[in-house]
């Protein structure tokens, strides 16, 4: 069973004493790897809409899927025309968000090194809004600035919609583990103060960059790769709630951990029982 964390614009209000069931429920896929409408193939980033509709970057099927709550199959809303770089194709899409202002979905089309926008009312083709970027994670703030992580330059950039260049808001000082550097930034989250949280994948940490600062602070992990409670192992999908608590999917530890604000270690809330397909296990969560 795969597990994914939605990277949402809205902060969630999760009680400090919240508890999670040991077993998870499959809401999309789970019918073995494949390309049928009830299947997924290496799904990665996702977005959950207000009505619980889930948009999934179905990476190795080169498409974006829409799964309405309670349904057993999804619908292709972008791509699905084979791997390629035409306007109606995607190449290993890795993240997706919804822009309600324009009623469109924004896609990190990683294999084509571009960010695409597809109008939800026109599912036949999309338009390129950012080019020449080795994108991984996407999010949007409350002022409709778009944030994109770039593996090639080890930075996160903020873009006004329709802007091509953007502004560096995290990293951008080469590959490394100093507080002003990132090493393969993956998924990102922006809070209401416009602080940027970054899953710093190969540094095995989550970084927080407050607005207009030149370096970040470590808010989870940062003690080398490992599965101890004060460590992370290849952090991926991540979100932050209203209390500043961080929830992060750890790919190589096959778990989701929760780090309270200011804590020196986290606690496991999902998985952590080895790699597997049982309802209480995860398999390389991203």
Question: Whereabouts are the PLM-identified features?
Answer:
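Short loop/turn segments that connect beta-strands within beta-propeller blades
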Residues: 68-72, 118-123, 160-164, 210-214, ...
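Beta-strand-rich domains and repeat architectures in extracellular enzymes and scaffolds
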Residues: 10-13, 28-62
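Beta-rich, blade/repeat-based domains predominating
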Residues: 36-51, 86-102, 131-146, 175-196, ...
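Residue position within the beta-strands of beta-propeller blades
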Residues: 55-58, 98, 106-109, 147-149, ...
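Blade/loop signatures of beta-propeller domains
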Residues: 2-26, 30
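A short beta-strand motif characteristic of beta-propeller blades
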Residues: 26-36, 75-86, 124-129, 168-178, ...
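Structural signal for beta-propeller blades
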Residues: 62-65, 113-116, 154-157, 166, ...
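Short loop/turn segments immediately following the C-termini of beta-strands
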Residues: 51, 59, 69, 101, ...
